[in-house]
Amino acid sequence: MTSPRKTHPLKKMINNSFIDLPTPSNISFWWNLGSLLGACLIIQITTGLFLAMHYTPDTQTAFSSVAHITRDVNHGWTIRYMHANGASMFFTCLFLHIGRGLYYGSFLSRETWNIGTILLLTTMATAFMGYVLPWGQMSLWGATVITNLLSAIPYIGSNLVEWVWGGFSVDKATLTRFFTFHFVLPFIIAALATIHLLFLHETGSHNPSGMTSNPDKITFHPYYTIKDILGLILLLLLLMSLTLFMPDLLTDPDNYTLANPLSTPPHIKPEWYFLFAYAILRSIPNKLGGVLALVLSILVLMIIPTTHLSNQQSMTFRPITQIMFWMLTANLLTLTWIGGQPVEYPFIIIGQIASIMYFLIITTLIPLSALIENKLLKW
């Protein structure tokens, strides 16, 4: 008799996605990140749900409701800090996941890659709106600065900003709508992640060698479920260490001051995971140019499948392109550092050089390296 997991309509879907899924036998730890992102999303939705039970999206009470969660709600501080540091874990896994996709040529599955880029944008939007909710100084001024960028759009800019704000400044209406979207978007992310998986399972996973793995596949369970559980344990270990020992390591002290529209913080900056994009935005003196560069810093990922000119899929056997990849990594770390620095010499010029290099490496140097390698291999 055939097992119910292979015949039952619902169990069959789960079976084909997580149990009997044919998986390359040689995929490394870097393929764990997808399941870790799923775990991060579940943690964020669960902790967020409990926080929403006690939070009030009102300018008069938002700050004190967060303080109430931290002080008076049973284990409220744990839930709050797990949610705040969970976002950092989420973005760490996201960046590593994208890096893996770039290095091993996973972007050649175009639908999966493009939906992944949309997922990144949606996650960034969700995290930005979540940062506004505690209604501290950095929440208010971060929201003001970033939403104000819409005013750079010709003709409709000013009207658009006031429409987003729900008034003439970031106020109660803005906070309420940001809370609404922050609550809804994670479920949209979950739906997009399901579509992401759907497209991935159409072609199957790639592997480190970049060659087809059809002749050599194994079932996902038990081999990769065990491997993923190990990754999950390490992730939870890191998250709980941050939450219990250093909960404020990655947050801004300014956000412990109640939002005051009459007092501007000395340095307005977003959370660490947005600093690279913020540095690109700041390094262009023109407002519209900065906004375009900011958007393109993410959307540039979508052109990578088109600029792939190598005859090999993966970078495993391509030393010149590997150098370019690690240059890009170092460049992103430089941009992250610059984003947190004040706008003064020498940080301005470093930021401008790093911003130019970011786009240059992705659009020109990596494709050029591929052509050189093709020539060297006489292909």
Swiss-Prot record:
Enumerate the residues binding heme b b566: 97, 196
- Which note does the record give on the cofactor? Binds 2 heme b groups non-covalently.
Q: How does it sit in the membrane?
A: Multi-pass membrane protein
Its transmembrane ranges are 33-53, 77-98, 113-133, 178-198, 226-246, 288-308, 320-340, 347-367
Q: What else is known?
A: Heme 1 (or BL or b562) is low-potential and absorbs at about 562 nm, and heme 2 (or BH or b566) is high-potential and absorbs at about 566 nm.
Family membership: Belongs to the cytochrome b family.
Q: What is this protein called?
A: Cytochrome b
Q: Which organism is it from?
A: Saimiri sciureus
